[in-house]
Amino acid sequence: MDATTAPHRIPPEMPQYGEANHIFEMMQNMLEQLLIHQPTDPIPFMIDHLQLDNDYVPKILVLGPPASGKTTVAMWLCKHLRSNLLSVENLIARQFSSLAAGARQHYQKFKTLPSGLLVRLVQARLREEDCVTRGWILDGIPETREQALLLQTLGIAPRHVIVLSAPDTVLIERNLGKRVDPLTGEVYHTTFDWPPQPEIQNRLLVPAGISEGETARKLLEFHRNIVRIAPSYPKILRVIPADQPCVDVFCQALTYVQTIHRSNAPFTPRVLLLGPMGSGKSLQAALLAQKYGLVNVCCGQLLKEAVADKSKYGKVILSFFEKEIAVPDSIIMKVLGRRLDQQDCVERGWVLHGFPRDLDQAHMLNSLGYKPNRVFFLNVPFDSILERLTLRRTDPVTGERYHLMYKPPPTVEIQARLLQNPKDTEEQVKLKMDLFCRTSAELEQFYQPVLPLNGDQDPYTVFEHLESGIINPLPNKVP
């Protein structure tokens, strides 16, 4: 761009396209790969990297002491994510590899591998096509800080590191009941995870090195190493308690590896708040606008402002207001579109509430390019909605608003003159709730992924959940 023509007005479609297609992250990933591999000809290298389309494949380390269940969790993650599991055992068991054959002989003799040899095995395996295209999960690797540093030196960097943790007494007791299926490699337990099939039961073997003394020695070695490995992965490491059912451990691990770490990409929030009347959308929108500078766009308020300004559309809207009938969607979109196209909405972002109310309006909003990047659904029980709305009152003298339960009038005199808005009668509230329930499921399906929130709690607690949903990236979808 020509610097002399500043300030520049960037079309809103440009940042939306960049955000939707992860342009910033793509450029960042390419730069990382250039710095790691340092190719002599970077252009063909970048083209090949883009064609691989593997920036978001799983790259996971699963670490933990003996009997913590790390192998089981790693295998389940591998099946669920359709990735590749790498462990010391399957690396040295690979056929048609002279490196693996040498490592196998060394392991059979010394029951361990030198750090350099293990890292070379990992590096060779990660270069193969299936690991490049579908990612990888390392089970129990690295074992020492030296191995972690060697992996980092080669540019082998995980996106998620899981460390399982449990008391030593629990692990020693658990290890004594450990059994292994020699055909599948699945790990079972005589007490906690015994297979129901008799054929599997009959072929289970007792693994070597599970005695109490041997387990205690391995635990001591693990504790000595993990405190030196952990600082190598400061922002991507998650400790998960392993002293709970294996399914719960797996669920926590899966939830973590589905998260996306915060990006440095520029982000302009475009927030849509959905929910029944009385769910607190207006309050939450005001709080977001106050703290983050977003433009608070209330559809109903925009229509009233258009009428007050006596604009071209305002005169048309006034005629519908006077007849007490709904304003056509096309006119609403004209007014709403003019507001969302203004520069403050483009630069600072917006929080929209009160529109859309049905699937047709959502399609119309989407077709005109007004696509939210965060959609929240405030869920509030019907009884709470009735309590919030039917007990609202207004003082006609001062204009002060009261609630008979949460903010009662201070004097009997004021209470005697309070009036109820006709829209807040129980019949009207039930009618509007019925209309909302008819369309809410379609809206929720249209705007996937929707972030559901419990709106029946303290407003500032709801606001904290809103903040978290806006600041943190949306989780990955895993089939």
Curated annotation (Swiss-Prot):
Please give the residue ranges the record annotates as the region LID 2: 391-424
Positions contributing to ATP 2 binding: 278-283, 392
Catalytic activity annotated for this protein? AMP + ATP = 2 ADP; a 2'-deoxyribonucleoside 5'-diphosphate + ATP = a 2'-deoxyribonucleoside 5'-triphosphate + ADP; a ribonucleoside 5'-diphosphate + ATP = a ribonucleoside 5'-triphosphate + ADP
Residue ranges of region Adenylate kinase 1? 58-258
Q: Where does ATP 1 bind?
A: 67-72
GO: which molecular function terms?
adenylate kinase activity; ATP binding; nucleoside diphosphate kinase activity
- Residue segments, region Adenylate kinase 2: 269-471
Q: Which UniProt keywords apply?
A: ATP-binding, Cell projection, Cytoplasm, Cytoskeleton, Kinase, Nucleotide-binding, Transferase
Q: What is its EC number?
A: 2.7.4.3, 2.7.4.6
Outline the segment boundaries, as ranges, of region: NMP 1: 87-113
Q: Which residues bind AMP 2?
A: 325-327, 354-357, 361
What is the superkingdom listed in this entry's lineage?
A: Eukaryota
Q: Where is this region: NMP 2?
A: 298-327
Q: Return the similarity comment.
A: Belongs to the adenylate kinase family.
Task: Give the HAMAP family listed for this entry.
Answer: Adenylate_kinase_Adk
> What's the subunit arrangement here?
Interacts with CFAP45 and CFAP52; CFAP45 and AK8 dimerization may create a cavity at the interface of the dimer that can accommodate AMP.
- Name of this protein: Adenylate kinase 8
